Amino acid sequence: MEKFNPSELCADIKIYDYKKKVKYDEKSLVIFEKTGKMIKAGKECEGMLYTLPANSIGFSPIVLGRVSDYTCAEKMLKQMLCRYLGKPVFAGYGEGLIFVHEKLNEVEMKAYFDLLYQVGAKNVVYADESVKGIPEGTPWEDVIWGMKNTYKNLRFAVEITKEQPMDYLRYSLAQLAENCKRWGLEEEMSKLHI
C-alpha cells in the first residue's frame, strides 16, 4: 500500500472558546519519546515529523475522523485545551460540544464523549452534520458558534474535520485496493470505475 505520512491522515481540530469568542486551528498530531512521554502536540508537530530524533515517534491519534489511539488523543486534547482555555478549575471546563463531520457508529461516538469528559468537560453535547433546522448553505463554523444559543452553558467546542479531504479519499482507495487483493478480488476491483 502507498505510504501515507501522519499529517496526510490526521484530522484537523478546531477549538472554539465561547468565553473569548476565539477559534483555534490545530492538527491531530503528537510526538512521543519511546519512553511514553509526550514531547509536542498539534500543529507544532508538522515541521518536526520529517526530522524526528531517533528516540521518538510521530503519529495521529485521530485518523479519518475516528479516535485511533484513545490514550494519546486524551493527552493531546488535554494539552490543547489547557493551552487555549487555561487550566481547568476544580469543576472542570464546564459544558463542551464535540462536532464531528464523519459518520460515526455508536462506539466511535462514545469514544468522543469519554474523551471530552476525561479532558475536563463537565457535560458533553454531541453534534454532527445531521443537525436539524440548519438553513442550507450555512457554514459549519457559524453552526458551531450558534450552538451557544441552544446550549446556554457551553464553554468550548471541539470540531473534528479535514481541510484536505482528498487525503482521506486517497487513503481509503489504497485500503480498498489492499483489501481486494487480500480477498482475491483484484479483477473485480479493476472493473470499478474509480
Predicted regions and their residues:
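Nucleotide/phosphate-binding catalytic cleft detector across ATP-hydrolyzing
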Residues: M1-E26, F32-K37, C45-I194
